[in-house]
C-alpha cells in the first residue's frame, strides 16, 4: 500500500551523515532496520501528478557530475587565483540555458530570493570548510522537457569560460569546462588532475555554492524540491580539488593555466524515514495509463556510494487509506450499545413481566459502555499529547553524553527525529480527525465501514480498481466527492444520539404494555363492549339450559336401562310363586 511522491507534494526530509559537505538535516544512525534493507517488492501503482524519479529512464531526472568552486587567498606570486573545487553527483540539465521564448517563460516562475553574487566566494585556506548559501541565478536550466512535464532549476551552475572582455582578436566565448560532465563516476574516480590552458583569461560563471532546487512548471506548477540533490550526491563520493590559475608569457602573449589536483574523497549516505521509502530497480513510468511498474525491485531507506545508476530511484510513501465497497451479513450499526440493546429487545418484548427489570439492566449496560468510551477518549487524548514527553526526554538525554561533539551530533539527531515525528503525528492526527468525522460500524476496528450505500452504476469496479492503484484522473473514482458525501451522511447521523431508534422502539413497547392505555381504549367503545357482553351472556345461558336438558334425558335413559337389566336377570326364576309375590318383586 504505497503511493509515489509527486512533484506537487511538499519537500520531504532527507537526512545525510555529513553536514559539513552536504547541507541538510543530519543523522548517521540510518538505516533504522538494517535487516529489512533491500527487501524485494513488486509494485504496480498509479499516479495523478508526475512522480519524482531519479535515473536514466523516461520520466526520471538524469544524474551527472557537477562542480562547485570557491576562491581562497593567493599563496604564490605567480598565481592569479587559488581555488578549492568540489565535484559530486547532481542533476543533469537537458539544455544549459533557456533561450528566447523559453527564457521569458521561465522568468514568471523565478523564485524569490537574493541573486547570486558577481564574484567568486572567498573562503579560508582550510579545505574542510564549505559554506552553502542559496541564491537565484540569472537564468534557469531545463532538467526535463517531455511528455512527463517540464522541470527547471534556478540554482547556479558554475563553469570555466573565456573572458573575452577587451580582446581584439577572435575569442572563443563558449564554455570550455562545463559544470556537468557526462561520464559520471569516471570523472570522479579516474581523473585526479585537471589542466586548462588558454591565451585568454579564465572566469568562473554562476558564482555561488548553492544546491539544485528543481521544480515542475508544466503541466502544473509545484514547489521546489532541494532535497532530491541529497540523494544524487550520496550515490557516489564527492571529490575535493585544490589548484590555482597562473599567468605566464608565451609567444609574447599572456598565457593562462589552471591546474587542479585531488587527493581527497568523502563518502556520503542519504536516508529517508517512515512513512517514506525508496524503490530501486527497473522502474517503468507509463504516462498514457498513468501507472508505474517495477518487478523485482528493492525497498531501501538509504543511498550510499555503492549505488549503481543502472537502476532508478522512485520515492514512495505509505498510503493513508483507500475506499473500497464491502458487503455486510448484518445491518450496519454505529455502536456496540445499540447492537446489545437491539439483541436484548428481541427476546424481551415477548416477556413483558421481566421487561422493566431488563430495560434497567440494559440502560446500566449503556452507561458502562459510554463510560468505557469516555475513558478510551481520554487515553487517546493523552497519547496525542505524549510529544511533550518526547520533548522532555530529548532535553534530559544530554546528561548521558560525555563530549561536546557527541552532544552536538546527538542533539541534531534528536531534533531531526522530533521533526520527523511531528510531521508523522500531524499526518496521523489528520487521519484521526477524518476518522472521528465518520460514522463507522462498531464491529470493525482495523478499518472503517461507513453507512454510505455503494452505487455500482456510478462507481463501477474498474473505477474502484484504478483508485486502488492510486490513479485519480477524470475516469477514476472522484475520491474527494465521495468523502464529501460520506461526511455529509455522517453529519446527518451525528444529529441523532446513537441508539435513538432503538430507544424509541423501547418507548413504544412500554406504551403498549401500559394498562391505562387499555382502559382508555375500552372507555372509548363502551356501547359496543356492552352489547358484546350481553350477547356473550345470552349464549352462555343458552348453553347452560341445553346442558341441563341433556343431563335429564341422560338420567332417564340410564334408569330405563337399569330396569331392563334387572328384569332380564329374573326371567324364569319366579315359577311356583304366588301372583302377589311377583307383583311385589316388580315393584321393588
Curated annotation (Swiss-Prot):
InterPro entries: GP41-like (IPR000328), HERV-K_env (IPR029104), Retroviral_env_glycoprotein (IPR051255). GO terms for cellular component: plasma membrane. Keywords: Cell membrane, Cleavage on pair of basic residues, Disulfide bond, ERV, Membrane, Transmembrane, Transmembrane helix, Transposable element, Viral envelope protein, Virion. One of its GO terms (molecular function) is structural molecule activity. Specific enzymatic cleavages in vivo yield the mature SU and TM proteins. Residues 355-375 are annotated as: Fusion peptide. The record marks 354-355 as: Cleavage. Expressed in lung, placenta, testis and peripheral blood lymphocytes. The chain crosses the membrane at residues 522-542. Its main location: virion. It is found in: Virion. Pfam families: GP41 (PF00517), HERV-K_env_2 (PF13804). Belongs to the beta type-B retroviral envelope protein family. HERV class-II K(HML-2) env subfamily. This envelope protein is encoded by a human specific provirus. Has a type 1 genome. The HERV-K(HML-2) family contains type 1 and type 2 genomes depending on the absence or presence of 292 nucleotides at the 5'-end of the env gene resulting in Env proteins of distinct sizes. Despite their overall retroviral envelope structure HERV-K(HML-2) type 1 envelope proteins lack a predictable signal sequence. Subgenomic RNA transcripts coding for full-length envelope proteins have been detected for both type of genomes. The surface (SU) and transmembrane (TM) proteins form a heterodimer. SU and TM are attached by noncovalent interactions or by a labile interchain disulfide bond. Retroviral envelope proteins mediate receptor recognition and membrane fusion during early infection. Endogenous envelope proteins may have kept, lost or modified their original function during evolution. SU mediates receptor recognition. This is Endogenous retrovirus group K member 7 Env polyprotein. It comes from Homo sapiens. The lineage of its organism: Eukaryota, Metazoa, Chordata, Craniata, Vertebrata.
Amino acid at each position: 500500500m504505497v503511493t509515489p511522491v509527486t512533484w506537487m507534494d511538499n519537500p520531504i526530509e532527507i537526512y545525510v551523515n555529513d553536514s559539513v559537505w552536504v547541507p541538510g538535516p543530519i543523522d548517521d544512525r540510518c538505516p533504522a532496520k538494517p535487516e529489512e534493507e533491500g527487501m524485494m517488492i513488486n509494485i504496480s501503482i498509479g499516479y495523478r501528478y508526475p512522480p519524482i524519479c531519479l535515473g536514466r529512464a523516461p520520466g526520471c531526472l538524469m544524474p551527472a557530475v557537477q562542480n562547485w568552486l570557491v576562491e581562497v587567498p593567493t599563496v604564490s606570486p605567480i598565481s592569479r587565483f587559488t581555488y578549492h573545487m568540489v565535484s559530486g553527483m547532481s542533476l543533469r540539465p537537458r539544455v544549459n540555458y533557456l533561450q528566447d521564448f523559453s527564457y521569458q517563460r521561465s522568468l514568471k516562475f523565478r523564485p524569490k530570493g537574493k541573486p547570486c553574487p558577481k564574484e567568486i566566494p572567498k573562503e579560508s585556506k582550510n579545505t574542510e570548510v564549505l559554506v552553502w548559501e542559496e541564491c537565484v541565478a540569472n537564468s534557469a536550466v531545463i532538467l526535463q522537457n517531455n511528455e512527463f512535464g517540464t522541470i527547471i532549476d534556478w540554482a547556479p551552475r558554475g563553469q570555466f569560460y573565456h573572458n573575452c572582455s577587451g580582446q581584439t582578436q577572435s575569442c572563443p566565448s563558449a564554455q570550455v569546462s562545463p559544470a556537468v560532465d557526462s561520464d559520471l563516476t569516471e570523472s570522479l574516480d579516474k581523473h585526479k588532475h585537471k589542466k586548462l590552458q588558454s591565451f585568454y583569461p579564465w572566469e568562473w560563471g554562476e558564482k555561488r555554492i548553492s544546491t539544485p532546487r528543481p521544480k515542475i512548471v508544466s503541466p502544473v506548477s509545484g514547489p521546489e524540491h532541494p532535497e532530491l540533490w541529497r540523494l544524487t550526491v550520496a550515490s557516489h563520493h564527492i571529490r575535493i580539488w585544490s589548484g590555482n590559475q597562473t599567468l605566464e608569457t608565451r609567444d609574447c602573449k599572456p598565457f593562462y593555466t589552471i591546474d587542479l589536483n585531488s587527493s581527497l574523497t568523502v563518502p556520503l549516505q542519504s536516508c529517508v524515514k517512515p512513512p517514506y521509502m525508496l524503490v530501486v530497480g527497473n522502474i517503468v513510468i507509463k504516462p498514457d495509463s498513468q501507472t508505474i511498474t517495477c518487478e523485482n525491485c528493492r525497498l531501501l531507506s538509504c543511498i550510499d556510494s555503492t549505488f549503481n545508476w543502472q537502476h532508478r530511484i522512485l520515492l514512495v510513501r505509505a498510503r493513508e487509506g483507500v475506499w473500497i465497497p464491502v458487503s455486510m451479513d448484518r445491518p450496519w450499526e454505529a455502536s456496540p450499545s445499540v447492537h446489545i440493546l437491539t439483541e436484548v429487545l428481541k427476546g424481551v418484548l415477548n416477556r413483558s413481566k421481566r421487561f422493566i427489570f431488563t430495560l434497567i439492566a440494559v440502560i446500566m449496560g449503556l452507561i458502562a459502555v459510554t463510560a468505557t468510551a469516555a475513558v478510551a477518549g481520554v487515553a487517546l487524548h493523552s497519547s496525542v499529547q505524549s510529544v511533550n514527553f518526547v520533548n522532555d526526554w530529548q532535553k534530559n538525554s544530554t546528561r548521558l553524553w560525555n563530549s561536546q561533539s557527541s552532544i552536538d551530533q546527538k542533539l541534531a539527531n534528536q531534533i531531526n527525529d522530533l521533526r520527523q515525528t511531528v510531521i508523522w503525528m500531524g499526518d496521523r492526527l489528520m487521519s484521526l480527525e477524518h476518522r472521528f468525522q465518520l460514522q463507522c460500524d462498531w464491529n470493525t476496528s482495523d478499518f472503517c465501514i461507513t453507512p454510505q450505500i455503494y452505487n455500482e452504476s456510478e462507481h463501477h469496479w474498474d473505477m474502484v480498481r484504478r483508485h486502488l492503484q492510486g490513479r485519480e484522473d477524470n475516469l477514476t473514482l472522484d475520491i474527494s466527492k465521495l468523502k464529501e458525501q460520506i461526511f455529509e451522511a455522517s453529519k446527518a447521523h451525528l444529529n441523532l444520539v446513537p441508539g435513538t431508534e432503538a430507544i424509541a422502539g423501547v418507548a413504544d413497547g412500554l406504551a403498549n404494555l401500559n394498562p391505562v392505555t387499555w382502559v382508555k381504549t375500552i372507555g372509548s367503545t363502551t356501547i359496543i363492549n356492552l352489547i358484546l357482553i350481553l350477547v356473550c351472556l345470552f349464549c352462555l345461558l343458552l348453553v347452560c339450559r341445553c346442558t341441563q336438558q341433556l343431563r335429564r334425558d341422560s338420567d332417564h335413559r340410564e334408569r330405563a336401562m337399569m330396569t331392563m337389566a334387572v328384569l332380564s336377570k329374573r326371567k324364569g326364576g319366579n315359577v311356583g310363586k304366588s301372583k302377589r309375590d311377583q307383583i311385589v318383586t316388580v315393584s321393588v
